[in-house]
Amino acid sequence: MKVSYNWLKDYLDLTTAPEALAEKITRTGIEVADVAQMSAGLKKIVVGHVLSCEPHPDSDHLHVCEVDVGEEEPFQIVCGAPNVAAGQYVIVALPNSRIADNVKIKKGKMRGVVSMGMICGLQEIGFADSVVPKEYVDGIFVFPEAIAPGTDVYEALGMTDYIIDLDLTANRADALGIHGVAHEVAAIESLTPHFEDVAVSESDVQTKNQLSAQVADEQLAPTYHLRMLQNVTVQPSPLWLQTRLWNAGIRPINNLVDVTNYMMLTYGQPLHAFDADTLTGDHKQIEVRLAKTGEKLTTLDEAEHDLTNEDIVITDGNQPIALAGVMGGFNSEITANTKNVIIEAAIFAPTAVRKTAQRHNLRSDASSRFEKGVNVADVQVALDAAAAMMAELGAGQVTAGVVSPTNLAPQPKVIQFDSARVNRVLGTDMSVQTMINLLERLGFEVANNADQLTVTIPARRWDIEIQADVIEEIARLYGYDNLPSTLPTGDMTTGALTTEQKALRRTRHTLEGAGLTQAISYALTTEEKAGQFTLAAKQTATVLDWPMTQDHAYLRMNLVTGLLDDAAYNVARKQTDLALYEQGRVFLQHADQARPNEVEYVAGLMSGNRQVKSWQEAAAPVDFYTIKGIVDTLMASYNLQAAVAYQATDAYPEMHPGRTAAIYVGETFVGIVGQIHPKIAKATHLKETYIFELDLAKILELQRQTIIAKPAPKFPEVTRDIALQVPEAITNADLVNAIKEKGGRYLVSVSLFDVYAGSHIEAGEKSMAYTLTYLNEDATLTEEEVNAAFEKVVAHLVATFQAKVR
């Protein structure tokens, strides 16, 4: 909202400088984006009177003008504007003047003819194209009235005025009119605004005999008023009105339309004027209703719009003539030939106006105000003021009476609260009288009954709803800078992470330490992806009632598909060596509740090379054992109650049937690890890709609650190596479990150090070599004790697996 400082002074006895006033406004809660004076930087620009205008002897578009600029002799100025003519009062930049963008104008020659300055358009002295009257956009500006030559143009064009640009939040729509801003400034400066009463001089013709109106549904337009003017003359507005408009960022059009915009700026109430003679029938009829499917409307910007049954329209009983609260129709536009005018002032349904403006891409000053709300008490006041001014400027007659099919009466809003609560909330020691004074400065009526305050809110402040709003108003005027600063009080407590939080943090640290990079995927996906790689029993994915897109309609039940999408994205950009993980929640349905359970999972993905090629080493591709080793490291970090075991599985159609293992902690299934199915890899353009997915919620339940530290052993370990030739179907886990079963109480670890299949080994068999480590924590082991335990292991392996000791 651009606020004219001079316009404010029409209502307030202001003495505070504009910059200081802007600072005060900002400190009370309305941000001031800028304070500007359009004349700043300009020099030696005056009003000139064109005495004569002749064609340039050496040009088909230039004119040689004699211009009275208040000097002893007229100045000869060459001008290229197509609309320059003798008798005009124009803007003249004298020699050595400064115009917009710090351009200096000098005496010069144009095609051999001396030119003593420049006749200017508004844009050349700093006006935006959007506020220049259309008839002057491509030419010079012509003053609509005579002004003494040589007079500085700044005052005449309103350029000496200071414009305070308010950056309003949606709740302060009351400041979208100069009256609302005047009330705000009056409260800040402890002043009383003085507004003139509106008086309308009416003719003997009754409006109701010329015009009728109806509103199909009161919800569409709770308030709807119409007035009528007859025998008006459409002409340019006086200069004072044009300056008020362009200083507010609005283009002047003609005296009737300019009045509606002026009243919108004054009261914050949008108005619209219809050419009454364009409406069908002798007795004019206005109807407010929802549009019908198939109806069209060409708006004032000459764009045609296909209307929907959610658009509120104004009709003449037959066809739409305006989009209510947004923009008028081209078919009822005020033109130079308009003689009779209907003025509309209304309150339209805010949500409907907002949706219509968005749907048709027609954001306007009017729609912005209707969306945020308008002052119920000022609707007819603005209408009456507009009618009176139109009659004055257009020399027309206002018919008697207002047609009002709906009229929402202002409802007094009363808020009661304990004055002590204000001090509790603000941390102040403010007296009750101070609170009352602050509220009365805002124009609120206050009654005090034993420090219980009853505040009556004026209709212009419809943003005040509850006690907290009133307390905020007190704080604003009291001054946020005056509120005392206090340190928080209370007992100091030591923060700590829960067991679960520690485990989750340890998970991230472990995986990042192993070289994986964290990824974050959308929790919403497609139905197909939601059901893949699921650790839980097959179930239906949870679907959103109102999804944003079909690709984000279901809640995920796994993390792997998100990692695959991330991998495919990277591969498409030539990044093929990938190591990613994601820790997050999946959503699993539960039979006893409508909403799904949120379960903590962690998943990882590796593809490409784990070791890039260098001058020392060849490239090493990722394989099953690479990712299984990472899972082993991760599982070891949890201090689990039972051993971790891997069992081959082909139960997952998305996984390679021969390179996938189910992961167990004791007897509890907690996840999978393995290679994704080649078909899925091909579909996503990935090389061999390995993944793991773990149910962290289950794993955290299987942690030991305490960790017992052991001292370093005092006695030496003893190791024995054994190489076994076994059938290929025998797994490492089978052999390790068998060794531990018969290893005796001194066996502390078993590690595989070699696997071989090839020459010197029968087909269908392989060689696996292990190191067995023995330790007695209380004494040194003897050879006899170790050999006896080792021989039991060998005998058991031979008997169980038909193993051959090599």
UniProtKB/Swiss-Prot annotation:
Gene Ontology biological process terms in this record: phenylalanyl-tRNA aminoacylation
Family matches, as Gene3D superfamilies: 3.30.56.10, Bira Bifunctional Protein, Domain 2 (3.30.930.10), Ferrodoxin-fold anticodon-binding domain (3.30.70.380), Nucleic acid-binding proteins (2.40.50.140), Phenylalanyl-trna Synthetase, Chain B, domain 3 (3.50.40.10)
Principal subcellular localization: cytoplasm
Localization per record: Cytoplasm
Stored SUPFAM superfamilies: Anticodon-binding domain of PheRS, Class II aaRS and biotin synthetases, Nucleic acid-binding proteins, PheT/TilS domain, Putative DNA-binding domain
Cofactor: Mg(2+)
Record domain tRNA-binding: where: 39-154
One function term, GO molecular function aspect: transferase activity
Enzyme Commission (EC) number: 6.1.1.20
Keywords assigned by UniProt, alphabetized: Aminoacyl-tRNA synthetase, ATP-binding, Cytoplasm, Ligase, Magnesium, Metal-binding, Nucleotide-binding, Protein biosynthesis, RNA-binding, tRNA-binding
Known catalytic reactions: tRNA(Phe) + L-phenylalanine + ATP = L-phenylalanyl-tRNA(Phe) + AMP + diphosphate + H(+)
Cofactor binding notes: Binds 2 magnesium ions per tetramer.
Domain B5: 410-485
Assembly: Tetramer of two alpha and two beta subunits.
Family as reported in the entry's similarity comment: Belongs to the phenylalanyl-tRNA synthetase beta subunit family. Type 1 subfamily.
Name under which the protein is recorded: Phenylalanine--tRNA ligase beta subunit
The encoding gene: pheT
